[in-house]
Amino acid sequence: LFISFEALAEERSTRILVTATEEATLSSEISAKIISIPVKAGNNFSKSDILIEFDCSFFEAQKDVVQAELDSARVTLKSNQELAAMRSIGEYEVQLSQIAVDRAQSELNIAELNTDRCIIRAPYDGVMSKVFVNEYESIERQQPLIEIIGSGTLEAKLMISSKWLSWLSEGYPLSIVIDENGLEYSAQIHALGADIDPVSQTIDATAQFDKNYKTLLPGMSGTATFLSLIHIS
């Protein structure tokens, strides 16, 4: 059996795409007007930094009203408890007063949740990839606002021949040359897909880079070459 080195090298190479392990499109949970977008596209941010702030005057006013209702319900409950102790009213009135307090407290919890939603904070360290809206723009609930990318470990997505499964497994080393900068990076197979495409006879795989290379960016592409020789019988 004669196999050229060129054929062997071609069989062990495949295209890859660099992706971020943390990437998200953030949407609004409320309908409101944007008053601030502190982090612009391309800028870095830290976990818990404010990414978008909404005009919260309506929700703050709602919370104040509910807080006043809760305070009033608590006063009524206390008064009825004192009257019940003197047997001026029955236990039924006290129970109704307690129900009113519980209801007002639940409404206050909802109001506070709405005010908390007036600020979108960064879930992790990263960079602002895209901004789909502008300051002073009114947006609707569930409307996509921004796209963020985490600054954590990057990975490479690739498709491999299903025939490679006879020798390829998790932890297998590979070398990746990136098209955009011509640099070579070391990585290893991190995960293999759960099923094989019946048409192309390929399977998805994920490779993790051996360290956090500063010259790598999500969206870069390149060629992966597996370092070890293929065993052929």
Give the location of each predicted region.
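Short coil-to-beta-strand transition motifs
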Residues: 10-13, 121-122, 178-186
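Low-complexity, intrinsically disordered
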Residues: 151, 170-186, 214
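Surface-exposed patches in structured soluble domains
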Residues: 17, 31, 35-38, 44-50, ...
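N-terminal beta-strand block that forms a small beta-sandwich/beta-barrel module immediately after a flexible targeting
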Residues: 2-31, 190-191, 220
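Structural microfeature recognizing short secondary-structure transition sites
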Residues: 129-130, 184-230
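A conserved signal-transducing helical linker
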Residues: 115-118
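Short, Lys/Arg- and Gly-enriched loop/turn segments at beta-strand edges
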Residues: 55-64, 152, 157, 183-187
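Alpha-helical coiled-coil segments
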Residues: 58-113, 131, 156, 200, ...
